[in-house]
Design a protein with these regions (language model features):
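Extreme N-terminal starter segment of soluble prokaryotic enzymes
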Residues: 1-4
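Short beta-strand segments
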Residues: 6-7, 57-58, 99-104, 154-155, ...
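Short catalytic helix/loop segments, enriched in acidic residues and glycine
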Residues: 20-44
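Flexible, glycine/proline-enriched loop segments at strand-loop-helix junctions
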Residues: 29-30, 123-134, 147-151, 183-190
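Glycine-rich nucleotide/cofactor/substrate-binding loop typically near the N-terminus or early
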Residues: 39-93
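Active-site glycine-rich loop that binds ribose-phosphate moieties when present
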Residues: 83-84, 121-147, 156-159
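Active-site rim beta-loop-alpha module in soluble metabolic enzymes
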Residues: 143-151, 155-204
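C-terminal accessory domains and tails appended to enzymatic cores
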Residues: 179, 192, 197-266
Length: 266
């Protein structure tokens, strides 16, 4: 069985502020290590549960955060930026039995984490699809479903886990922390890794019968930007329209068209 892990940093245990997520700062290194160790815990658990192949994609920033030496020997790591359409890298296809997300965070404008954001924190204020607030979990879970692959697991802040469970009923989750203003109440990294690894056998078992959620027949997307000039510029995307000084709308029936829109306007 084959599994694909998307790994981000803002949802890992103990990360609290933006400085810890940015590689230019001294406080980043421990968080990058924790990102790698949580991904490693998921991979170990998957292999122990019967997985034959595990691919981990480094999703944070430039995609060069995870120290490959910290991963299980038989895991594979996708590093860097492929410049594929969002959620449709050439590496990920319908041959996978399940997608898992580690270290994910709440959506832009949501309170689950002081570092809540959607893709680009300095640019995107809020993103909705068919009236529902979407973050990165929702974007990628639907991208997996578009490929016919179920999303089995997510770890990250409590807000993200709750939203993810509403998006994918039956989803396995490990909450790492809860947001409180510009602070977090966090589990210890050791406990989070134990919980992630311990849940992977259940994820492997679930993959044998799991089916991806049905995609909507139509997608109405609204992206609200921090700056009005970004909205104006992105409104020139074919099929997009400016519906307020800071909000661009886009409609499509095919989720692949939505992902292409995201690639060029986020």
């Amino acid at each position: 069985m084959k599994f694909y892990i998307l790994c981000d940093i803002e949802g890992v245990a103990s990360l609290t502020c933006w400085d810890e997520a940015r590689s230019a700062n001294a406080c980043y290194a421990p968080m990058a290590q924790e990102m790698a160790l949580e991904a490693a815990a998921a991979a170990r658990g998957l292999f122990s549960g019967g997985a034959d192949e595990v691919v981990i994609e480094d999703m944070h920033g430039d995609g060069c955060n995870i120290d490959c030496a910290l991963l299980p020997r038989d895991a594979r790591l996708l590093r860097g930026i492929t410049h594929d359409i969002v959620g449709l890298t050439g590496i990920f296809d319908e041959s996978y039995d399940g997608m898992l997300m580690v270290g994910f965070h709440d959506a832009a404008s949501a309170p689950g984490n002081p570092t809540s954001h959607t893709m680009v924190s300095s640019r995107i204020f809020r993103l909705t699809v068919n009236g529902a607030l979407w973050g990165e979990f929702e974007m990628y879970a639907h991208a997996a479903a578009y490929r016919g692959v179920p999303t089995l697991f997510a770890s990250g802040d409590e807000g993200m886990c709750a939203a993810a469970a509403r998006t994918v009923p039956g989803l396995l989750t490990v909450p790492t922390k809860s947001g409180h203003g510009y602070g977090v109440l966090t589990k210890t990294p050791e406990l989070v890794r134990e919980e992630i690894e311990g849940m992977m056998a259940e994820a492997v078992a679930a993959a044998k019968t799991a089916v991806p959620p049905a995609l909507p027949e139509h997608f109405h997307v609204e992206v609200t930007y921090v700056h009005h000039y970004d909205a104006y510029g992105c409104s020139h995307y074919p099929g997009a329209s400016l519906i307020s000084p800071t909000t661009v709308a886009f409609d499509a029936d095919d989720y692949g068209d939505v992902l292409r829109f995201f690639y060029f306007v986020i």
